[in-house]
Amino acid sequence: MAKFGRILFKLVLIFGVIFLLLSGLIWNGYLLQVPTLEKIQSFKLSQASEIYSSDSVLLGKMYFENRRCISIKEIPEKLTNCLVATEDSRFFEHNGVDLKGLIRVGVKTLLLAENSGGGSTITQQLVKNRYPRSSFKNTNLLFHKVREWFTAMKVERLYSKNQIIEYYLNTVPFGHNCFGIYTASGYYFNKTPAQLEIQEMATLIGLLKGTSQYDPERNPKKSTNRRNLILRNMHEQGYLQKGELKKAIKTKLILASAEERELSIAPFFLQHIKIKVQNILSSINKSEYLHLNPYTDGLKLYTTIDSRVQKHAESALKNHLIILQKQFDAEWNERRWDNNKSTLLQLIRLKRYKGHKKVISLLESGSAFSPKIEEQLKTMKTDLTRLRAGFTCIKNTGEVLAWVGGRDFGYSQYDHVKSTRQVGSVFKPIVYATAVDQGVSICNYF
């Protein structure tokens, strides 16, 4: 018996040494491509750059990932509790890897053949978001898991629990190209995280399990069920009183409207300014010490546009075009040639008309074009009679206060402010005024 004990002790010792050796190699990145401490510290999240008017109104954004990072001070404690109760109830107890959770997963999955409910901690999820499995050559699931465990422990060594919560909530996607809790709060509820109510927090945290499946717009029933489950978990773990639970479950969820989400101020100007920003930064980035990317670096870009003047300009252009359109239609929609036979006969004799007649006969027979194309041709014909205009308001200093490139940016992105059409008679007052300044009499002929 004593001999068996010595053999067992030696085996345990040997395996222990091997385990420690492998752990050291993995920890230092010699095996499984585990990120180093320096690489983890140097990680930077992509943030959207925001474009503002001169009166500090957000006009639009430039981004690859629509994200704005916030500090833990801007994240309410209830939101942290909601996340912990849902994703990692022992978050404040483990060192990045929840051994109890792993045992539970193993027992349920292997022995009981039940759904284990997942075993990844918040820190491990953060690691997966930062370093996706697809970025590593080895595709073995076990190797991925071991890599995540060691990386999670490194993250816990570098950052406090609050910092990990902060990084996690700034990293995760919430659907609709919303990354991070700040952008998601604004998109779904038109609020900042600090303004969210508990049922709204639970709805957003519920999206982490599946952004499409639990989308409150597309799948309101599934979203509500998920939200209520999260609220009950919070109550069971002592984060929510019974009265708060009942109130939150009964409260109807009010999502932000499309108008609240849409940044529709000065769209033509934004189209122009985004190109300008890239050109300006290209010249600045020639310095070896500075390289700025408007789509990833979270810049704040301020313009001369005044949102109040812009709104008045857009309204004035639309209203005036309505009046002019009515006048145009009354004047030009009439088929005057029907009342003048001689003009009609002259038109029919033209070679150009004969060419059009062949096309018209093909359209009428249906032998050349599909109904869809014919409908598009009708739309194009209607467009020919639609009046277009552009408008700018510029101070004597050269600052652009308003920029209206057309009637409807959603319908046509052609910017009439930048168009190179001939000015026509609009230029005559400039010529005449210059002539008068030069002493030329208005009675002179040239």
Model-predicted regions and their roles:
Residues 71-122, 182:
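Flexible, acidic/glycine-enriched loop-and-adjacent beta/alpha segments
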Residues 92-102, 179-181, 241-244, 436-446:
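Short, well-structured active-site flanking segments
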